[in-house]
From Swiss-Prot:
Heterodimer of a 70 kDa and a 82 kDa subunit. Part of the early transcription complex composed of ETF, RAP94, and the DNA-directed RNA polymerase. GO terms for molecular function: DNA binding. This is Early transcription factor 82 kDa subunit. Disulfide bonds: none annotated. The keyword DNA-binding applies. It is found in: Virion. InterPro entries: Poxvirus_early-TF_lsu. One of its GO terms (biological process) is positive regulation of DNA-templated transcription.
Length: 760
C-alpha cells in the first residue's frame, strides 16, 4: 500500500474595517505549506480582482483553528489570535458561519432583508456547517462598530486550547505522517424481524394488520411514518413503497402509493410468522479506513480539558464518537476507521492527523510497539497482572530524573518517597515508605516503568532470556540486583548459566527453557526408557532425592523452534536426530541403519526442541550429573518403533519404477523427503495491506475480462492461494510490495514466453 505524506491544510483570517477593507491578513500554517494552498489561491484572487482591498501585507503564524471547534469556540480562538477585545462576527466569502442566508452567502456589510437572515447555533461544529472546510478555511472577521449593528456574538476561550493545538500541530509537522485511505460502503438497507416494532407499526389508525413491507431506493420507515424522500412522479411509480392490508385498503394519508399485486410482497415471508418488519438505513453508511506509517496505541485517553475534539465512549477504550454524534471512530495500531452516513476521506484524514498528533504527546505513540511475542513465547504469561498486583511494566514517554537514581545508561532505580503512607500491621501502625518504580530502556528505545508501589523493583524474565537472549522486564516486590540476568541486562556483565542442576522435576508438557531445569518424559516413553531405572522424589515438592541413569527432558541450546515439516527434516539430518512429536517418532533410515552413527534423542514441546538426557544423583549428595542417553535405551527406541525396510524387488508399472528404495518416473529419480506426499495451504484473509489483496489487484483486469462465476469470493480465494503457493509465500501484512511485484512480473513473463512457444 502506497502511503502519501499528509499535512494540515493552511487557513487564512481576514479582518475587515468599517470601509470593508482588509486591515489584517493572517495565514495559519508553516510558510512552506502556504504557497500552493487553497487559501493562497483565494488571497491571489482577491488581490487581482480587488487590488485596493488589502491595506497591509500578510502575516504568517504557525497556528490552526481546529475544525472540531463550535462556532463560539472558533470566535474565541480567532479573536485571541487577532488580539481584539470586542466581540466579533464570523463570516466567509463562499459559505456561512455565524449567520445563514437562505439561497445566498451572508455579508454583514450588505444586509437587504434581515428577515431572511437566521443565526446558526453557537454549538454547531465548523466541519458540520461547511463540509469542504478541510481543504482550507477562510475566516472573515468584523465587529459591531464596523458595520453599525448588534450582530456580534459572544465567545468561549481558554488558554488550554492554544497550548494543546500548538503542541499537536508542531508534532504533526515534525513526524510527517503518511497515510492511505480506503472506502467501504454498507448495504443500502437491512430487514430485521423485531417484535418491539410491531406496536409502533400496527398503531397506525384503522390499520389492523401489517402483512409485509418491501422497499426500494429513496424510502425509509420510522415509527408509524412512511416518508418518500423525492417528490412523487408517476413515471417512477414502480419504484415507490407500497403497503396493503387484506382488503387492499390504505389508511395512511401522507406519502402512500399503491400496488397491483399483493403477492409481490406477501410471498417474501409466511404471513402467519410475520410480527413486524423494520427497514433500516435508507442511505448506506460509509466506512473509511485510514492507514498510517507509524504505530498508534489504540487505547486513547482523552484529557478532560481536551473536550473540543472527540468524545470517548467510557466503556470501550478504542471507540470514540465525534462531537456531532454522527461519526463513529475506532482506533487500531495501524489504522483508524470512520463510520458515518456522511463523511469524506479528507475529513477522515484530518481527524487521523490530530489523533496521531495528540496521541504522540499524551498517549505515547512509539516507533515500535511493546513486544508481545518473542520466538513463539508470550512474556505476559511469565509476567502476569492479577487484580491489584501490577507486575507488567508500562511504557512511558519520558524519564522523571527527580524521582529516580541512574544506575546505568539503560536503567534507573526509584527513590523512596517517605512522605506518603502508613500501614496497619495488627494493631500497630508501621511506617511504610513508598518507592517510585524502576525504569528500563530496551534496545529499541522503549522506556518501561514499574507502576505498582508494592511491585516497584524491576527484574528480567529468566525463561525469556534463557531461550532468546532478550532482556524482558517484569516488576517484583523485592530488588533483583544480585540476579545474574539483571547484571547482564543492566551492567553488561557476561551471563553464565549455572552448571548446578535444579533438583525439582516438573511434569511433562511444560516448556523447559533454562538449561538447569528438568522435566519428566511422556507416560509411554517413561515406561519404555525408565522401567528398569530408579528415581525417588519428595511428594508434593517433586524434589529429586535419588536418581540412577534416569532419562529426563532438558532444554536444548541454542533454543530452536520447528514450524513445518521442512524444518523438522533439516533438523533431523543435521543433528542425526530421533525426534518425538505427538506420540510419533521421526528420523531418517540412514540414522537408524548406520551403526557408526550415535543418534541424539529429542522431543518437540509446543514447537520447541528439547533433548533427552540421563541423570544420576546420590542420596547424600546435592549434585546431579548429566550424561547422554546410553546405547541400550537408543536400541529400545529403535526396536519399539517400526521402520519401513527398503523394497528390494523392483516394481515397474505405467512408467513408474521402484527399486532399491527409490522411485523413478520415466527413468528420472524422484527426490522426496518422505513417502507421504502432502500439500499444505495456509488460510488467506484478503485484508487491506495484505499480499493476497495485492495479488487480486495485480490480476484485477485479467479476472474482470476472463472470469465469469456465481461466486467470485470463492474463486478469488482459490486463485490467490494457488498464486501464493507458486510464489512460495504466505499471506502477510506488508508495507513494501516491491519483492512481491517482481515475483508476479517474473511469473507473468514466464507464462507469456511459455504460451508463445506453445503456439509457435
Amino acid at each position: 500500500m502506497d502511503y502519501i505524506e499528509t499535512f494540515i491544510n493552511p487557513q487564512v483570517i481576514f479582518l475587515y474595517n468599517e470601509n470593508k477593507k482588509i486591515i489584517k491578513t493572517i495565514f495559519l500554517s508553516k510558510d512552506s505549506m502556504i504557497e500552493d494552498s487553497h487559501v493562497m489561491t483565494v488571497y491571489n484572487y482577491l488581490l487581482s480582482s480587488h487590488s485596493d482591498i488589502f491595506e497591509n501585507k500578510p502575516q504568517f503564524i504557525n497556528d490552526h483553528v481546529i475544525l472540531t471547534f463550535t462556532l463560539e469556540q472558533a470566535r474565541g480562538y480567532i479573536k485571541n489570535i487577532l488580539g481584539l477585545s470586542d466581540d466579533i462576527i464570523l463570516f466567509s466569502i463562499w459559505n456561512n458561519f455565524d449567520y445563514y442566508l437562505k439561497n445566498g452567502i451572508f455579508d454583514p456589510y450588505n444586509i437587504q432583508n434581515m428577515l431572511l437572515v437566521e443565526p446558526n447555533d453557537d454549538k454547531s461544529i465548523l466541519y458540520n456547517i461547511y463540509q469542504n472546510i478541510v481543504e482550507g478555511a477562510v475566516f472573515c472577521v468584523t465587529t459591531n462598530k464596523n458595520i453599525g449593528s448588534q450582530l456580534a456574538r459572544s465567545n468561549v476561550y481558554s488558554s488550554v486550547y492554544r497550548d494543546y493545538i500548538s503542541e499537536i500541530i508542531n508534532n504533526i509537522y515534525k513526524n510527517r505522517y503518511a497515510m492511505k485511505s480506503s472506502i467501504i460502503d454498507a448495504m443500502e438497507y437491512s430487514i430485521n424481524i423485531d417484535f418491539q416494532d410491531l406496536l409502533r407499526i400496527s398503531n397506525i389508525p384503522d390499520y389492523n394488520k401489517t402483512l409485509c413491507i418491501s422497499a426500494y431506493n429513496n424510502f425509509y420507515i420510522k415509527g408509524n411514518k412512511i416518508t418518500i424522500l423525492d417528490n412523487f412522479d408517476s413515471m417512477y411509480e414502480s419504484k415507490y413503497l407500497k403497503i396493503y392490508d387484506k382488503n387492499i385498503n390504505i389508511n395512511i394519508y401522507d406519502d402512500v402509493l399503491y400496488v397491483k399485486k399483493l403477492s409481490d410482497f406477501t410471498d417474501i415471508l409466511n404471513k402467519y410468522n410475520i410480527k413486524s418488519i423494520n427497514i433500516k438505513s435508507l442511505k448506506p453508511k460509509t466506512t473509511i479506513y485510514v492507514y498510517f506509517n507509524t504505530f498508534l496505541n489504540p487505547n486513547l485517553t482523552i484529557e478532560f480539558d481536551f473536550d473540543f475534539f472527540i468524545n470517548d465512549t467510557k466503556k470501550t477504550k478504542n471507540i470514540f464518537i465525534d462531537l456531532t454524534g454522527k461519526i463513529n471512530i475506532m482506533t487500531s495500531q495501524s489504522h483508524i476507521s470512520y463510520r458515518s452516513y456522511n463523511i469524506s476521506t479528507d475529513l477522515a484524514k484530518y481527524f487521523t492527523l490530530f489523533i496521531l498528533g495528540y496521541s504522540h504527546i499524551f498517549n505515547k505513540v512509539q516507533s515500535k510497539a511493546k513486544i508481545k511475542k518473542i520466538d513463539e513465547l508470550y512474556p505476559s504469561r511469565y509476567c502476569q497482572n492479577y487484580k491489584d498486583i501490577k507486575r507488567q511494566p508500562i511504557l512511558i514517554d519520558h524519564i522523571d530524573e527527580s524521582r529516580l537514581i541512574k544506575i546505568s545508561d539503560n536503567f534507573y532505580t526509584g527513590k523512596e518517597d517517605s512522605t506518603k503512607t502508613y500501614q496497619r500491621k495488627g494493631t500497630k501502625k508501621v511506617y511504610d515508605p513508598l518507592k517510585h518504580g524502576d525504569v528500563y530502556i530496551d534496545s529499541n528505545g522503549l522506556k518501561y516503568q514499574c507502576s505498582s508501589i508494592y511491585y516497584s523493583n524491576m527484574g528480567f524474565l529468566g525463561n525469556i532470556y534463557s531461550a532468546t537472549g532478550i532482556c524482558y522486564p517484569c516488576c517484583y516486590s523485592k530488588p533483583k540486583i544480585r540476579d545474574t540476568i539483571f547484571n547482564t541486562c543492566v551492567h553488561g556483565t557476561k551471563f553464565i548459566h549455572e552448571e548446578k542442576i535444579n533438583p525439582i522435576i516438573v511434569n511433562y508438557g511444560r516448556l523447559i527453557l533454562n538449561p538447569s531445569n528438568l522435566s519428566n518424559l511422556p507416560y509411554k516413553l517413561n515406561l519404555l526408557l525408565n522401567s528398569k531405572n530408579q528415581i525417588r522424589i519428595v511428594k508434593h515438592t517433586n524434589r529429586i532425592i535419588l536418581a540412577k541413569n534416569y532419562t529426563v527432558i532438558m532444554a536444548y541450546q541454542p533454543s530452536t523452534i520447528i514450524k513445518d515439516f521442512n524444518e523438522m527434516y533439516n533438523f533431523i539430518i543435521e543433528n542425526n536426530a530421533i525426534l518425538f512429536n505427538d506420540n510419533m517418532m521421526y528420523t531418517h533410515k540412514d540414522i537408524i541403519e548406520n551403526n557408526n552413527i550415535t543418534p541424539s534423542i529429542f522431543i518437540l514441546i509446543q514447537n520447541r526442541i528439547h533433548q533427552f538426557k540421563n541423570i544420576n544423583k546420590e542420596q547424600d549428595n546435592d549434585n546431579i550429573t548429566v550424561s547422554i542417553v546410553d546405547s541400550n535405551k537408543i536400541n529400545l527406541i529403535k526396536n519399539k518403533f517400526s521402520v519401513l525396510n527398503n523394497i528390494t524387488k523392483e516394481i515397474s508399472e505405467n512408467g513408474i519404477t521402484v527399486k532399491n528404495g527409490k522411485c523413478y518416473i520415466d527413468g528420472e529419480l524422484v527426490k522426496n523427503k518422505n513417502i507421504t506426499y502432502f500439500t499444505k495451504f495456509s488460510n488467506i484473509t484478503i485484508r487491506p495491506k495484505s499480499i493476497s489483496e495485492y495479488i487480486l489487484k495485480y490480476f484485477k483486469k485479467y479476472i474482470d475480462d476472463n472470469i465469469y462465476t456465481d461466486n467470485y469470493f470463492l474463486f478469488n480465494k482459490i486463485f490467490v492461494t494457488n498464486i501464493l503457493n507458486i510464489m512460495h509465500e504466505n499471506d502477510a501484512i506488508l508495507n513494501d510490495f516491491s519483492v512481491i511485484q517482481k515475483k508476479l512480473d517474473d511469473m507473468s513473463s514466464d507464462y507469456i514466453v511459455t504460451q508463445s512457444k506453445t503456439y509457435n
